[in-house]
C-alpha cells in the first residue's frame, strides 16, 4: 500500500498538509534563498507555481539530495503511522460512495456507509491495541492523521446525506405521480368513448334501413322548412323536428322511433346514459354550436378548449375527444356528401361549395340543397337529430 500511494502525485511533498519544517530538523532551510529576478518588475517567474523546481535549480546538488531525503522520511513516517490503514480505509469508502451504484436489495451495498465505518473503527482499534499503540512518538504527526481521518469522515457523511436526499426526492416524486394522475378516470373515459363509438357506428349503419313512413315524413318536413320540394325518390332530407330523438352527445343519434313505455322511465334513461358515458345535453349543445360556427376550421385552440371546458363543465380531455369524434362523424360526412354532389354535376361556386351551400333551417338543422336540374332532389346525410344544437 505504501508503494501505491508513493506513485500518486499528490503525495509528492508535505508542504500542502501542514507539517512544519522543524518537525524533522530543518532540511528545507535552503528554500529561504530568493530566486534570481530576471525582470525589475512583477512577481518572480514561476516562483509560486513551481516552487520545488525554482529552488532546486538554484540549489547545489547536495542540497537537492537532502530535500529528497527529507521528503522520503516524511512519506515513510506517514505510511508507517499506526493510523494510516484506517485513513486508507475511509478514503476507499469515500471512493466507493461516489462510484458504486447503490442497490438496497443487494447484500453488501452498505459497505461504504458511515455506520459501517464506525464498525471498522471499533475492529481496527481492538486489533491495533493488541499489536502496537495507536499513536507514534510524534504528536504533530498524530494530530495530522486524526484530522485527515476526521475530514474524510465528514466527507463520507455528506455523501450519505446526498444519497438520502436523492432517495427521498425519488420517493416523493413517484408518490406524487401516482396520486395526482387520474389514471382510472382516463381509462374509464377511453373505455366509455370506445363503447359509444361502436354503438354510434351501428346506429349509423342502420340509418340506411329507415321505413318508408319516416322517409315521407322527412320529405314533408324539408318542404315546409326549406321551401324546396324533395321527391320521395331522392335521398333523405334532414329535418328540424323530433328533438326528443337526441340523446347525450348527439354525435350519432338514432332516428325517431315510436315511443314505448320503457322510454318514459327516467331511471332507465339515466342508467342508459350513464352506461354509455354520454355528456350532458347542455354541454353538447355548446360544443355543437361552436363546431357549426367554425366549420371551415373545426379545430379549437388550447385557449378555446379551456373556455369550452369551463362553459360545459367538462374536462379539456373530454372536450378534445368530443371534437375529434365530431370531425370524423359530422364534418367528414358533410364533406363527402358535398364531393358526391359535385361529382354528379352540381354547379360549383368559387368558394368550393355547391351553389346550394349548407342551408340552416332556422338554425335547427343543416341540409345540402342542389339547385338546377337536381332541385327536386333533397340531400340528406343520414344524420337526423344531430343539428339541434340550440
UniProtKB/Swiss-Prot annotation:
Keywords: Activator, Developmental protein, DNA-binding, Homeobox, Nucleus, Proto-oncogene, Transcription. SUPFAM superfamilies: Homeodomain-like. Disulfide bonds: none annotated. It comes from the Eukaryota. Its main location: nucleus. Residues 190-202 have a biased composition (Basic and acidic residues). Gene3D superfamilies: Homeodomain-like. Residues 203-213 have a biased composition (Polar residues). Residues 299-329 are annotated as: Interaction with DNA. Expressed at high levels in the lung with lower levels detected in the heart and brain. Expressed in pancreatic islets (beta-cells and non-beta-cells). One of its GO terms (cellular component) is nucleus. InterPro entries: HD, Homeodomain-like_sf, KN_HD, PKNOX/Meis_N, TALE_homeobox. Changing residue 321 to S: Loss of binding to other proteins. Residues 190-279 are annotated as: Disordered. SMART domains: HOX (SM00389). It is found in: Nucleus. Residues 108-192 form the MEIS N-terminal domain. Disruption phenotype: Mice die between embryonic days 11.5 and 14.5, showing internal hemorrhage, liver hypoplasia and anemia. One of its GO terms (molecular function) is chromatin binding. Interacts with the N-terminal region of PBX1 to form a heterodimer which binds DNA including a cAMP-responsive sequence in CYP17. Also forms heterodimers with PBX2. Forms heterotrimers with PBX1 or PBX2 and a number of HOX proteins including HOXA9, HOXD4 and HOXD9 where it acts as a non-DNA-binding partner. Also forms heterotrimers with PBX1 and HOX proteins including HOXD9 and HOXD10 where PBX1 is the non-DNA-binding partner. Heterodimer with DLX3. Heterodimer with HOXB13. Belongs to the TALE/MEIS homeobox family. It is linked to Meis1 serves as a site of viral integration in 15% of the tumors arising in BXH-2 mice that develop myeloid leukemia as a result of the expression of an ecotropic murine leukemia virus. This is Homeobox protein Meis1. It comes from Mus musculus (Mouse). The lineage of its organism: Eukaryota, Metazoa, Chordata, Craniata, Vertebrata.
